[in-house]
Amino acid sequence: ANGIKPMHIDYLRQCLDNEAPVDASIHARFRELLHQYVIVGGMPEAVTAFLNTRQIGKVLAIQRRIVDEYKADMVKYALMADKPKIRECFESIPSQLSREYKKFTFSTVRPGGRGRDYAGSLQWIEDAGIIRRCYNTETTELPLDGNRIQSEFKVYMSDIGLLVSMLEDGTQSSILRGELYGYKGAIFENLIADILGKMGRKLYYYHKNGGIELDFLMRHKGQCVPIECKATTGNAKSMRTVLGHPEKYHVDYAIKLGDYNV
């Protein structure tokens, strides 16, 4: 639908395998498509509207209607006592992600909010497939699920396009200009969470109060591999620290993802 041929995909994989720069014109085209995906996401109706019209305004209207339908379902299907709490949790997600440290806090949902009051409401949203949780881990070692901290997690929208539609008007235009670093990196992080989730991967991260924070952890070839997301070519201080102390963190290599060429 976007004119990308299998040979282009094969070429891109070859460049990644060899850690070689992608041809500038091909890189620019894939980058353009990535920015479009951030705005459109993967909801079938939104994708169809974009392919048929190429009008972001129509896509945004569909996405915001879907978000409104989610809210209506919360009122329709949830228990009476949970209805306002579910909506509060859902509507807090952009604010949760816009903070420097993106751990989900119930006090952000409502001042004085506690986990025991809202845990069931957040679970309802997760069970509906609207969000994905990303759990903090005790260590940067396998097994990731066995090391997860149940009470510490970030919450991402399952569909990046829906997250962007929940932000203020004009965000889409900024993204098309290549500005993926807004909201303290929330858009770029949620993009990676969207991609990993659609690959069938559970989400984990690593944060310690000493200042070490790795955006994602994944199992790859029998190892724990950190993933650092930097929309710009910023420093990955935590990654350098972890790689510099293999005896402590047991990490041999890491992946840095950004909006730039190899």
Residue spans for each PLM region:
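Structural motif
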Residues: 223-225, 253
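Catalytic cores of nucleic-acid endonucleases
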Residues: 231-262
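Short catalytic-loop micro-motif centered on adjacent basic/acidic residues
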Residues: 204-205, 226-229
